[in-house]
């Protein structure tokens, strides 16, 4: 996300008093929903980086390409939140993905994880796969 589902999700989180972290993308499909990032932050939820494009072939072509994608995402977020306060990210495909090997070599994820830490980012994965990256399920 953000997406058309973000406002209803925010309503549920507010009603149930549950804090959340939103791993944000800036793809063309959610361009019109980017102002909702301000609502997410105003509600006290955490904003974290995920990807500007979510196109593995571009993101993982090199470490420079990955950080260019993060820069583009940060620029897309600047009108809505203090991007300097964002210090969490989730790698597209996860930190142990193998799809990145196809584009940036076998060691690209090891290098990116070290670079992320050197840049002051904490990175996170997940422990349950909702299959939302493999099917046409709506984003948050």
List the predicted regions and their residue ranges:
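Alpha-helical scaffold elements lining the catalytic groove of polysaccharide deacetylases
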Residues: 8, 55-81, 97-140
């Amino acid at each position: 996300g953000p997406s058309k589902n973000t406002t209803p999700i925010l309503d549920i989180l507010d009603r149930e008093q549950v804090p959340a972290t939103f791993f944000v993308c800036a793809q063309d499909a959610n361009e019109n929903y980017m102002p909702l990032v301000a609502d997410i932050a105003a509600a006290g939820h955490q904003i974290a980086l995920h990807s500007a494009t979510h196109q593995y072939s571009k993101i993982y072509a090199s470490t420079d390409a990955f950080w260019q994608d993060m820069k583009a995402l940060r620029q897309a977020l600047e009108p809505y939140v203090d991007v300097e306060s964002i210090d969490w990210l989730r790698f597209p495909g996860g930190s142990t993905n193998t799809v990145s090997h196809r584009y940036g070599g076998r060691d690209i994820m090891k290098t990116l994880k070290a670079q992320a830490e050197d840049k002051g980012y904490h990175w996170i994965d997940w422990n349950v796969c909702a299959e939302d990256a493999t099917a046409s399920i709506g984003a948050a």
